[in-house]
Amino acid sequence: MQFEKMITEGSNTASAEIDRVSTLEMCRIINDEDKTVPLAVERVLPDIAAAIDVIHAQVSGGGRLIYLGAGTSGRLGILDASECPPTYGVKPGLVVGLIAGGEYAIQHAVEGAEDSREGGVNDLKNINLTAQDVVVGIAASGRTPYVIAGLEYARQLGCRTVGISCNPGSAVSTTAEFAITPIVGAEVVTGSSRMKAGTAQKLVLNMLSTGLMIKSGKVFGNLMVDVVATNEKLHVRQVNIVKNATGCSAEQAEAALIACERNCKTAIVMVLKNLDAAEAKKRLDQHGGFIRQVLDKE
């Protein structure tokens, strides 16, 4: 795909004179363009759903979810991966974010990093990629060599692969087994794909990781029942989660949480089934950690 023909590099007529308008009008132009992003994501929901099902199947079989990107795309993958352990109680290595240029590139531009095909392959080798894993390549342009090479290597190993880009028919889309391509159009600032394209990528990543966690039993109703209480706010949230799930008082919720070492799932089953902590945990273990199955089948 020729650089000048890429949609993400096109000129946006709506912002052609954005440097001449008032600050408020500037904000309106940006906001109006941002409004189009969820609609672009909506058009690819079937592709996102298919990717979630594949990711869940692989993770259920012992695999990992690996995000691979450069620049903004890489940072978004790292952001999504880093939020999974505290929100859903998963091990830090289950969802991994890799960025061209390594850790330094999270805050700084690393010259030439995204153009390194070798870097994409080596980063995957360094985390001992296996055929059980799913690699999600993220690149707004769809032409980033670091990402393309990583996807090619992953497919050679037998991994399932997903490509997220904002240009139709891109190399990332055609290299990956599953393509997710929200077409957001030209950016307000020409070529600044951290804007609409980045927003679209963030929305897609939200769905991928959240969908995985819901299907893995980490959500009951709409409650994050595996949240890890690492601060006072989350201690309070745990109490509210148990209250909302069971209808018990705050005092009952806190007592149950203390009895089970602050595991929301166990506390919820304790209250709803009138069990002690050991028996509640045993039943959850018997049903793979799914509260719904414990309640529905017993």
From Swiss-Prot:
It catalyses: N-acetyl-D-muramate 6-phosphate + H2O = N-acetyl-D-glucosamine 6-phosphate + (R)-lactate. Pfam families: GKRP-like_C, GKRP_SIS_N. Changing residue 114 to Q: 2000-fold reduction in catalytic activity and 4-fold increase in substrate affinity. It is an enzyme of class 4 (lyase). The active site is at 83 (proton donor), 114. GO terms for biological process: 1,6-anhydro-N-acetyl-beta-muramic acid catabolic process; amino sugar catabolic process; N-acetylmuramic acid catabolic process; peptidoglycan turnover. Keywords: Carbohydrate metabolism, Lyase. The keyword Lyase applies. PANTHER family: GLUCOKINASE REGULATORY PROTEIN. Specifically catalyzes the cleavage of the D-lactyl ether substituent of MurNAc 6-phosphate, producing GlcNAc 6-phosphate and D-lactate. Is required for growth on MurNAc as the sole source of carbon and energy. Together with AnmK, is also required for the utilization of anhydro-N-acetylmuramic acid (anhMurNAc) either imported from the medium or derived from its own cell wall murein, and thus plays a role in cell wall recycling. NCBIfam families: N-acetylmuramic acid 6-phosphate etherase, PRK05441.1, PRK12570.1. Homodimer. A lyase-type mechanism (elimination/hydration) is suggested for the cleavage of the lactyl ether bond of MurNAc 6-phosphate, with the formation of an alpha,beta-unsaturated aldehyde intermediate with (E)-stereochemistry, followed by the syn addition of water to give product. Belongs to the GCKR-like family. MurNAc-6-P etherase subfamily. This is N-acetylmuramic acid 6-phosphate etherase. The gene is murQ.
